Amino acid sequence: MGVEGADGTAGLQLPIGRATFAGSTRCLIPADGFYEFTEPKVQGKKTKWLFTMAGQPWFWILGIVKDGAFAMLTTEPGPDVAPYHDRQIVLLPPDAGVHWLDLSAAQDLMLAPSPAGALTVRRIWPE
């Protein structure tokens, strides 16, 4: 099943299960970080980790939107995220977001995991 590109073409091919995203358009979600939570629990809570993009104050999360709702795209984890989770959200630096919207870059490059060193990780809880 594929997701229709912003220009009406079938640009994005995703294995998206039973949901139908035909007619969806691409979107960008601005963020300055995201969290992952890991076991074992400490005082009944999982350990909280903050991921930020190295050398950037913010980044884009790639998404799709349909009928007023959006979904963030995920991919296999890159080396920075793999120790904490079995997948990661798809990220782009601030200057690359336009390529997601205008389909000017190869889909496989856009949906690739972040390379080693692209993200910084900091434990938030417990301190």
Where are these regions (language model features)?
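A structured binding-face within diverse protein domains that lines the active/interaction site
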Residues: 1-127
